[in-house]
């Protein structure tokens, strides 16, 4: 049984749009826009502002579970913020290693970290240590910064760090949102890790959905850009 998931889309998929899309039906769960973690533990109001679904059992009005995404590069502060987030009982916690925005990347966030598999492992391990085993813990990544040379290394580092599932957007940071998405590389990553993989990128139609499943070997698809 395949799942259809709603991607986090900064500047686009806010709580209003998430509510509209999930009201249509068909989404199994989604991820909110990222919450940036720097050198402090954020106040509860920050989490609730970016993901107001936390005030409603971490679900949209239609009942779709909404997970919370953290973005940052310091394992210590990522773990401290995850610890606070756990107290708000989110539907799950996701780590952002996929955002290609220059403003984010300049501050060592998102896809800019894909050249450092060891750091990805350190972040995932630190967060895993504070997230309950019964709370879904995932990460979302791209295929690399300028090329796909470290795609498998990054995926394996995150898997070894203890995430439950990995979402892979089939583009590099340099690719931005330009088509095509490299589905064949998602399949290579899937074959290299032992955890479930979710495919993301350039799925616009039912035909795209089926073809993406066939080319990646992934049953689950995340819809975004």
Label every model-predicted segment:
Residues 1-225:
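Flavin-dependent oxidoreductase catalytic cores
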């Amino acid at each position: 049984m395949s799942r259809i998931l709603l991607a986090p889309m900064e500047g686009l998929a806010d709580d209003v749009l998430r509510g509209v899309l999930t009201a249509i039906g068909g989404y199994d769960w989604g991820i909110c826009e990222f919450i940036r973690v720097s050198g402090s533990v954020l106040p509860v109001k920050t989490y609730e502002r970016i993901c107001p679904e936390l005030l409603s059992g971490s679900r949209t009005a239609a009942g779709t579970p909404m997970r919370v995404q953290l973005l940052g590069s310091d394992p210590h502060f990522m773990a401290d913020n995850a610890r606070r987030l756990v107290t708000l009982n989110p539907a799950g916690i996701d780590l952002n290693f996929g955002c290609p925005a220059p403003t984010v990347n300049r501050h060592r966030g998102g896809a800019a970290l894909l050249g450092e598999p060891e750091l990805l492992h350190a972040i995932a391990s630190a967060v895993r240590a504070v997230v309950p085993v019964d709370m879904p813990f995932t990460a979302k990544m791209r295929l690399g910064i300028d090329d796909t040379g470290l795609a498998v290394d990054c995926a394996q580092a995150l898997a070894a760090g203890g995430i439950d599932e990995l979402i892979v957007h089939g583009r590099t940071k340099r690719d931005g949102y330009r088509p095509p998405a490299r589905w064949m590389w998602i399949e290579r990553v899937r074959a290299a890790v032992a955890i479930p993989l979710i495919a993301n990128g350039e799925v616009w139609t039912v035909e795209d959905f089926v073809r993406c499943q066939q080319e990646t070997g992934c049953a689950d698809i995340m819809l975004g850009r």
